[in-house]
Amino acid sequence: MEHNGSFRVDSEFRYTLFPIVYSVIFILGVVANGYVLWVFANLYPSKKLNEIKIFMVNLTMADLLFLITLPLWIVYYYNEGDWILPNFLCNVAGCLFFINTYCSVAFLGVITYNRYQAVAYPIKTAQATTRKRGISLSLIIWVSIVATASYFLATDSTNLVPNKDGSGNITRCFEHYEPYSVPILVVHVFIAFCFFLVFFLIFYCNLVIIHTLLTQPMRQQRKAGVKRRALWMVCTVLAVFIICFVPHHVVQLPWTLAELGYQTNFHQAINDAHQITLCLLSTNCVLDPVIYCFLTKKFRKHLSEKFYSMRSSRKCSRATSDTCTEVIVPANQTPIVSLKN
């Protein structure tokens, strides 16, 4: 653990914001992603999963890995940025944060490319055996990102800073960079470059998909519902990227420069923006399951059946209650015949 007594800006609103946002995301994310896994486990035999469903299962696993660390971050921010847990848990939380972020980017990228191929080259895609490719690509993504993230497990990512009143020290987690560190700057530049490369590829593929769907001759168009769902899927993937990932990566490099001491004029404003983008980044765990509704027919059918059965049970419950009210009358009065049909 390093002692860092140098002045750093802080955004104190995060100690209220993060516990609330992370608590909501934890509850919704665990329910949504747990349900997705349950659906895949019960409706799809593992040997019959095609390429895109393999990517979806892996994306769900990446989201769950991050979600299990949220209680650690909630405790951290509730204690106003003091890591009171064992130091190794800070490393684990940071490692899984990195894995979730870039596995999500990678799997959303390959899902988009899969849909691009299906629209741009439908015959070739229909004839291709994609299950093995899906497994191979998933392994490559996991191995490369986990290997990169393992760096966080090998180093102590905590540091000591004075508390507000100066009476002692508190332990920060992933909040310290060596001043003017060139290697750290190079790493962040490389990460930003890779992210925006993937983002522009996804943006291009989605534009091609939208253009193809909107300009198909009437005789080649599928049913209106299928086309509408395909367009919604494209819009949802773009929305997840633009809402969750783009703001963080736009702010991350200027924030890194400020933290390293290269640019301090707008340090406070950049730090405030960085906290907000971290919240937005975590919402991908809740938004990812929405994509599955537009990608998988069985998933939509199962979800609509469950929703219909819940509505039916409520109606039956109300009908039973109304029936009981009509039947139970005082003994000295003549029952009134209901006019309901």
Curated annotation (Swiss-Prot):
Cellular component per GO, a single term: plasma membrane
Residue positions with a glycan: N4, N169
Extracellular side: 1-16, 75-91, 156-184, 255-275
Molecular functions per Gene Ontology: lipopolysaccharide binding; lipopolysaccharide immune receptor activity; phospholipid binding; platelet activating factor receptor activity
Expression sites by tissue: Found in a range of organs. Expressed most strongly in spleen, followed by skeletal muscle, lung and small intestine. Expressed at moderate levels in the heart. Expressed at relatively low levels in the brain, liver and kidney.
One of the GO biological process terms: phospholipase C-activating G protein-coupled receptor signaling pathway
Swiss-Prot/TrEMBL keywords: Cell membrane, Chemotaxis, Disulfide bond, G-protein coupled receptor, Glycoprotein, Membrane, Receptor, Transducer, Transmembrane, Transmembrane helix
Membrane topology note: Multi-pass membrane protein
Matches recorded under InterPro entries: GPCR_Rhodpsn, GPCR_Rhodpsn_7TM, PAF_rcpt
Spans within the Cytoplasmic topological domain: 39-54, 114-133, 206-233, 296-341
Induction: By lipopolysaccharide (LPS).
Disulfide linkage: C90-C173
Transmembrane segments: 17-38, 55-74, 92-113, 134-155, 185-205, 234-254, 276-295
Subcellular location: Cell membrane
SUPFAM superfamilies reported in the protein's UniProt record: Family A G protein-coupled receptor-like
PROSITE patterns: G_PROTEIN_RECEP_F1_1, G_PROTEIN_RECEP_F1_2
Summary of subunit composition and partner proteins: Interacts with ARRB1.
Protein family: Belongs to the G-protein coupled receptor 1 family.
Function: Receptor for platelet activating factor, a chemotactic phospholipid mediator that possesses potent inflammatory, smooth-muscle contractile and hypotensive activity. Seems to mediate its action via a G protein that activates a phosphatidylinositol-calcium second messenger system.
Protein name listed in UniProt: Platelet-activating factor receptor
Species name: Mus musculus
Originating gene: Ptafr
